[in-house]
C-alpha cells in the first residue's frame, strides 16, 4: 500500500528539469517512500554531532554616518553596523551517532542509480568513523574520494591547530560505471602557471581533492539565516561533476536548501527532505517557484 503523501515514480517523472520537490518530515520515513535507484546523486550533510545546539541568523550591513564611532570600518573606509535578523536552530547532539546515521546511509544508498554517486559531508568529529561504517555498508571497493573543503575564516584557538576544514566522503555504486563529468566542472588556476604554457594556464586545471572555498558570510547575499549553511559553490561543483541536466539529485538533510538551489540553477531535478519547520520555511522562501506543489 502506498504511503499517503508519498512521491511515486510517476510523480517524479512529472517534475520538470530545474525543479524539485520538498518533503517535510523524518528523512528515514520519507526516503522509504521514494522509488529505488531513482537518483543519480545523493548529497548528505547530516548534523556533525558537535554536542551543541546549532544556531544561525542573517546580519544586514547598514551604513552609518561618517565619523560614527559605533560603526565598524568597511569598504572604502565607510562605517557600517550589522543588524541581526531572525535566527534558526537545530539540535546537534547524539548519544549513539552510528545508530542515527547508518540507517539513513543505507536508505540513501537504496535510492542511488547504478551509475550514481553519494557524497557524505562531515567534519573531524565523525568523518573517520563514518568512513568505516560506509565501508562496512557498501564495501571499500566503492570508495572513490576523500574531499577536503578548506577555508580560512572564523574564530581561532591558541591551544591547538585551528580546525579549518570539513570532509566529504565520496562513494559510487559501481567503480566501472559511475558518471563523472570532468569537462564541465569549474576549473582552478595553476599554482605555477609558468610551467604549463599559456594555453593550459588560461584554461586552468581540474580541482584536486582539496577545495579552497570561503564559508557563507554572515552578512552575505547568499546567507539564508539557517545554521551551518553550505556555500552554493561547493554544491554547484558536486552537482556538475556527478549528474547530468535533468537527472535527479537527493538531499535528505536539506537544511537551507543549497543543494536545491544548485540543482535548479544547473537544470537538475531535486528532492529535499528536512523535518525542521524552520528549514522548511527557509527552503520555501529560497527556492520559490522551483518547488513543485507538495503532495
Regions found by a protein language model. Name each.
Residues 1-293:
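Core catalytic lobe of class I
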Amino acid at each position: 500500500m502506498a504511503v499517503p503523501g508519498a512521491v511515486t515514480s510517476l510523480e517524479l517523472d512529472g517534475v520538470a528539469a530545474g525543479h524539485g520537490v520538498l518533503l517535510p518530515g523524518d528523512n528515514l520515513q520519507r526516503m522509504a517512500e521514494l522509488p529505488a535507484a531513482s537518483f543519480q546523486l545523493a548529497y548528505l550533510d547530516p548534523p556533525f554531532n558537535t554536542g551543541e545546539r546549532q544556531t544561525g541568523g542573517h546580519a544586514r550591513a547598514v551604513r552609518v554616518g561618517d565619523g560614527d564611532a559605533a560603526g565598524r570600518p568597511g569598504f572604502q573606509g565607510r562605517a557600517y553596523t550589522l543588524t541581526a535578523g531572525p535566527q534558526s536552530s537545530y539540535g546537534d547532539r547524539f548519544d549513539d551517532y552510528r545508530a542515527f546515521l547508518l540507517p539513513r546511509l543505507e536508505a540513501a544508498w537504496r535510492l542511488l542509480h547504478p551509475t550514481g554517486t553519494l557524497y557524505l559531508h562531515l567534519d573531524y568529529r565523525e568523518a573517520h568513523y563514518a568512513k568505516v561504517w560506509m565501508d562496512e555498508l557498501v564495501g571499500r571497493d566503492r570508495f572513490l574520494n576523500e574531499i577536503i573543503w578548506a577555508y580560512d575564516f572564523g574564530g581561532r584557538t591558541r591551544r591547538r591547530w585551528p580546525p579549518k576544514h570539513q570532509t566529504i566522503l565520496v562513494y559510487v555504486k559501481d567503480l566501472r560505471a559511475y558518471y563523472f563529468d570532468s569537462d564541465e566542472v569549474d576549473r582552478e588556476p595553476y599554482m605555477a602557471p609558468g610551467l604549463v604554457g599559456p594555453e593550459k594556464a588560461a584554461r586552468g586545471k581540474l580541482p584536486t581533492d582539496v577545495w579552497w572555498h570561503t564559508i557563507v558570510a554572515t552578512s552575505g547575499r547568499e546567507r539564508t539565516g539557517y545554521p551551518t549553511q553550505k556555500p552554493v559553490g561547493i554544491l554547484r561543483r558536486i552537482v556538475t561533476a556527478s549528474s547530468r541536466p535533468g537527472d535527479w539529485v537527493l538531499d535528505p538533510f536539506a537544511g537551507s536548501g543549497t543543494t536545491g538551489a544548485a540543482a535548479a540553477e544547473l537544470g537538475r531535478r531535486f528532492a529535499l527532505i528536512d523535518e525542521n519547520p524552520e528549514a522548511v520555511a527557509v527552503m520555501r522562501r529560497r527556492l520559490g517557484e522551483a518547488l513543485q506543489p507538495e503532495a
